[in-house]
Amino acid sequence: MEQTWRWYGPNDPVSLNDIRQAGATGIVNALHHIPNGEVWTKEEILIRKALIEDKGLTWSVVESVPVHEEIKTQTGNYQLWIDNYKQTLRNLAECGIDTVCYNFMPVLDWTRTDLEFEMDDGSKALRFDQIAFAAFELHILKRPSAEGAYSDEEQAQAKIYFDNMSDADIAKLTGNIIAGLPGAEEGYTLQEFQAQLDLYDGITKDKLREHMVYFLKELMPICDANGLKMAVHPDDPPRPILGLPRIVSTIEDIDWLTAEVPSQMNGITMCTGSYGARGDNDLVNMIRQHGDRIYFTHLRSTQREDNQLSFHEAAHLDGDVDMYNVVMEILKEEQRRDDAGDVRLIPMRPDHGHQMLDDLNKKTNPGYSAIGRLKGLAEVRGLEMALKRAFFTK
């Protein structure tokens, strides 16, 4: 696997020099300063590429070129945004970048209720608490028809949870859910957030699928001509939330997506933390079935809790994800590609990491502190080396 690291650009508290010392060789990056929908010019791409390469690193994956909300709802200027997206892909390809991670989640990218969940060892992790989320949706946001998303027991627990919240607790939970997290390009007030949700009224799962297929079919001629791989990131959490449809959550969704858009350039990001939050997702089987479409991997683990819809982010080799067999299957796919003449390694980044040690005293991007990811990368690197020496001849 190619060892990569997500970097948020010049304003990231983790520098390119730090990343080199972590042992990563590839950078996962995006031009966050360009507004959603606008074209990434070759000039801007080359400036960022030179900045990365000057440190002896490679811009391996774009994560991500954001998909404008009007593309997802297929309203307003959606065709203009698609045309701009196509031009951005052309420009990336001409600048030598061939892998783009993106998502098709409405409104929010990834969602957590707690950004500072304390682990037994004192480190801090990200957490999704189903009851806290229900309290937000039912009693803070007060989304119409939200009751239908929760059982009677969950509604009762959410009411107790809400009744025990202070104003500061409410503000913190609200901020955690609706403020733009790393990777989400937008932040919303409560009123703006509800207005964004309202834009999806009447958009069912089938309708969102239709819009995604239209979008990808527009892109594929450019991707096919330039060998540019689109790697969709799964929904996080991998289920409908806030009344919004989710369409990249299970192996059935991948089956559908690859059947509807059969181009080999239509691929996936295997995010083990996102897919792994569902107990019915067999990650190892997903890799076996769709390994030829995996162009990027995010390796992390989650631990589901007593309420199986609640989870926290575990250490990379702990939790519910069978990281041993996940890495084994990725290495088998790399071996298959190598035998077929494709020598490029699959880019892998240690996704998220616990805030620990000296980082506990620093301002960090939630999930993206340096030391926790350094630990995760080292653990996965060691696992990979052991598997290669034991089972692989090349």
Swiss-Prot record:
Cofactor(s) essential for the protein: Fe(2+); Mn(2+)
UniProt entry tagged with the keyword rRNA processing: no
SUPFAM superfamilies: Xylose isomerase-like
InterPro entries given in the database record: Man_deHydtase, Xyl_isomerase-like_sf
Any GO MF annotation of the entry: manganese ion binding
Keywords: Iron, Lyase, Manganese
Enzyme Commission code(s) on record: 4.2.1.8
Reactions it catalyzes: D-mannonate = 2-dehydro-3-deoxy-D-gluconate + H2O
Entry superkingdom: Bacteria
Pathway stated in the Swiss-Prot or TrEMBL entry: Carbohydrate metabolism; pentose and glucuronate interconversion
Gene3D superfamilies: Divalent-metal-dependent TIM barrel enzymes
Principal EC category: lyase
Pfam families named in the record: UxuA
GO biological-process terms attached to the record: D-glucuronate catabolic process
Chain's role: Catalyzes the dehydration of D-mannonate.
Family: Belongs to the mannonate dehydratase family.
Annotated PANTHER family: MANNONATE DEHYDRATASE
Protein name as it appears in the record: Mannonate dehydratase
Gene source species: Photobacterium profundum (strain SS9)
Gene: uxuA
